[in-house]
A protein has these predicted regions:
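Residues lining hydrophobic/aromatic ligand-binding pockets adjacent to catalytic sites
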Residues: 1-240
Length: 240
């Protein structure tokens, strides 16, 4: 039986295709035990203000943990979450809108601080929940790489092979960046099929899914994403 997997680092409120690939796969592995990357999307994302201007929404990182793996990185002790919450809601014009979603997001940031990885993972799981509206049949199996493979790998593609083997997956779903930065021959030698999903529609690769929810509403975003997911599953089957 063919099983597809999407393997990705835990980004902070990432863009919609991140979730499209998750929901189009049988398994999602959160790559949380690789090195944190400064100035990446591990601790920041982009939103647009009421005038359509882009701005960074960042969680400030404790400098002492910046060189560690993602699951060891923490946010600054003096980070004022409530102040940031009000600032973001004012900039985006959502101070009196999307109260349930805003409350849930900031509650997760508060509850799982100071660990960046834990915050990101819980936010990803929350977004998956509201997109699927609790429909468990749509959701993939979710694993953390730190729980199923504790070895530190010098070769990142061999790491993927081991994760695929540990979850009994024989097909890996990749976006353009992953496809170009891995040794595809190693995957093929280990009989792992590769699906390049570079059909990112009209989504801006920098903009958070939260921005789309603010602009179009969760029902419209959910409908759009699930429609693409259904197309993807057919597309993936043909590519396996």
């Amino acid at each position: 039986m063919t099983r597809s997997v999407m393997i990705h680092q835990p980004h902070f409120l990432p863009w919609p295709p991140y979730f499209i690939r998750i929901l189009s796969s049988d398994v999602f592995i959160i790559l949380d035990n690789v090195t944190f990357q400064k100035d990446s999307f591990h601790n920041r994302t982009i939103l647009t203000d009421i005038n359509g201007k882009e701005f960074w929404f960042s969680l400030p990182v404790n400098h002492k943990t910046r060189t560690k793996t993602i699951n060891q990185v923490t946010i600054c002790e003096n980070f004022q979450i409530d102040k940031m919450n009000k600032s973001i809601c004012t900039k985006t014009g959502t101070l009196k809108k999307y109260n349930d979603i805003n409350f849930a997001i900031w509650d997760i940031i508060k509850q799982y601080s100071p660990n960046i990885s834990e915050i990101n993972i819980k936010l990803i799981e929350y977004i998956i929940d509201i997109i699927t509206q609790g429909n468990e049949s749509i959701k993939p199996e979710i694993y953390r790489s730190s729980k199923i493979d504790k070895k530190i790998w010098s070769n990142k593609t061999e790491h993927l092979v081991n994760l695929c083997n540990n979850t009994k997956c024989d097909t890996i779903v990749m976006g353009k960046y992953s496809y170009n930065c891995h040794d595809l021959n190693i995957l093929k030698e280990n009989e792992i099929n590769i699906i390049l999903d570079d059909r990112d529609m009209s989504y801006n690769p920098k903009i958070s899914i939260l921005d789309y929810i603010y602009r179009y509403g969760i029902d419209n975003v959910s409908k759009s994403i699930l429609s693409i997911v259904n197309e993807n599953k057919f597309y993936y089957e043909r590519r396996k």
